[in-house]
């Protein structure tokens, strides 16, 4: 929606060949949301807060009373778009998410349902894992609070499987949100190309993910164990060094699997963009690993 118009305006007014945006990786399902786009819960999926409900095909066919509810939720926060103060993403999402839930519950025609099923099949088990993490987050609470489910339960835990069965509608809603987000980012990219951009959207890949996020929980074997995080050594910018609090990929796992998880992540980003900027691109060759509790100054480069 808004991204689509932004790209079209940029193409017409600046004659630019591309527009670089901040990372649009997936965040938490409910507020409070992480304000930094460089600390996502998953780099494999999209940030659904960018969805524009009015651009979803089913919005146009909503029953009048349901559409009125969606519009009322929009109007409750729309005026803030014209204010000069920083946007309150939590307030916006608290209005947008129930509006999206109303559209989801209204259903789809057979053609659209088949498209949704195709998306789920193509996205594969990683989509199911992400939707499961979102469900656990919403029902059991944020994993960085007093809730211990992140550490005590794996994705194959019987309690997790039971939770998905009991709240399958919410599980399905989280998969649906990813489908809609992918459709709308694709539409934005096509809009940019149609208006003359050569590359269109340039996505930004964050250097890592939240240590308690979906990627780290669902597939711990992909990450280094022992509480290791990545950052950078002391320099003129920060003489103490920096600890970004993000677990690095396990290089042995990557090598043993032919870097499949990384290749799939890059491929998924190129599905919605003409180019990808890799934040801290030298991280492809080396990363500053920091042992838990020792501080950034006592880290070391791992290749």
State each model region's role:
Residues 16, 273-275:
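A structural motif
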Residues 1-219, 254-255:
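Acidic/aromatic-lined carbohydrate-recognition and catalytic surfaces
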Residues 198-261, 265-268, 272, 286-303:
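Substrate-binding/active-site clefts of carbohydrate-active enzymes
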């Amino acid at each position: 929606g808004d991204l689509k118009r932004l790209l079209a305006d940029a193409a017409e007014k600046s004659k630019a060949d591309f527009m670089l945006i901040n990372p649009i990786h997936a965040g938490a399902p409910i507020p409070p949301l992480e304000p930094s786009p460089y600390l996502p819960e998953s780099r494999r999926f999209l940030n659904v807060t960018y969805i524009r409900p009015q651009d979803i095909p089913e919005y146009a066919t909503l029953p009048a009373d349901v559409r009125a509810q969606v519009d009322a939720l929009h109007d409750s926060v729309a005026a803030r778009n014209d204010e000069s103060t920083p946007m309150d993403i939590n307030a916006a999402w608290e209005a947008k998410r129930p509006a999206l839930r109303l559209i989801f519950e209204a259903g789809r025609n057979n053609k659209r349902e088949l498209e949704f099923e195709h998306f789920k099949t193509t996205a594969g088990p990683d989509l199911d894992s992400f939707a499961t993490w979102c469900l656990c987050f919403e029902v059991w609470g944020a994993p960085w609070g007093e809730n211990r489910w992140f550490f005590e339960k794996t994705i194959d835990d019987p309690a997790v499987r039971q939770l998905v069965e009991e709240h399958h509608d919410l599980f399905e809603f989280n998969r649906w949100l990813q489908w809609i987000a992918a459709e709308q980012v694709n539409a934005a990219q096509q809009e940019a190309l149609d208006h003359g951009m050569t590359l269109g959207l340039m996505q930004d890949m964050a250097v890592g993910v939240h240590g308690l996020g979906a990627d780290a929980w669902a597939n711990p074997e992909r990450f280094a164990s022992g509480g290791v995080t990545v950052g950078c050594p002391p320099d003129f910018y920060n003489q103490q060094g920096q600890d970004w609090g993000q677990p690095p990929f396990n290089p042995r796992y990557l090598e043993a699997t032919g870097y499949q998880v990384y290749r799939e992540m890059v491929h998924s980003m190129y599905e919605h963009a003409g180019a990808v900027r890799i934040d801290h691109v030298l991280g492809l060759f080396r990363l500053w690993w920091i042992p838990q509790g020792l501080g950034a100054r006592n880290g070391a480069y791992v290749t």
